[in-house]
Structures are given as structure tokens and as C-alpha cells.
UniProtKB/Swiss-Prot annotation:
Signal sequence annotation: 1-22
Organism: Pelophylax saharicus (Sahara frog)
Name the UniProt record assigns to this protein: Temporin-SHe
Family in the record: Belongs to the frog skin active peptide (FSAP) family. Temporin subfamily.
Keywords, ordered alphabetically: Amidation, Amphibian defense peptide, Antibiotic, Antimicrobial, Cleavage on pair of basic residues, Cytolysis, Fungicide, Hemolysis, Immunity, Innate immunity, Membrane, Secreted, Signal, Target cell membrane, Target membrane
Residues annotated with Phenylalanine amide modification: 62
Compartment(s): Secreted; Target cell membrane
Removed propeptide positions: 23-46
């Protein structure tokens, strides 16, 4: 009976550690996903003024 209790305690302990590691990994993935949204906004901010500049340049060229 003591051996059974010892084995169950060991399984519970290992399971708890496994769940903790999975939770940390999930949190890290969520942080990475949140970080990419911010970088997408930065890329968009850099891209739109360049696009507007090109459109203005083309308007001057073809407007003559």
C-alpha cells in the first residue's frame, strides 16, 4: 500500500510539473503573437507614406 501511495504521489508531482511547463509555453506563444501585431502596425506605418509618395510621383508624371 505504501508503494502505491508513493507511485501516485510521484505521478501527481510529475503531472503538475508538466502542466506548469505547458502553461509557460502557451503564455510565451501568446506574447509572441501579441508582439507580431505591433510590428505589423509599424510596417504599415512605414509602407503607407511610401505608397502615397509613389502615387503622387506617378500623378505628376502622367498629369503632364
Amino acid at each position: 500500500m505504501f508503494t502505491l501511495k508513493k507511485s501516485l504521489l510521484l505521478l501527481f508531482f510529475l503531472g503538475t510539473i508538466n502542466l506548469s511547463l505547458c502553461e509557460q509555453e502557451r503564455d510565451a506563444e501568446e506574447e509572441r503573437r501579441d508582439g507580431t501585431d505591433e510590428s505589423d502596425v509599424e510596417v504599415e506605418k512605414r509602407f503607407l507614406p511610401a505608397l502615397a509618395g509613389i502615387a503622387g510621383l506617378l500623378g505628376k508624371i502622367f498629369g503632364k
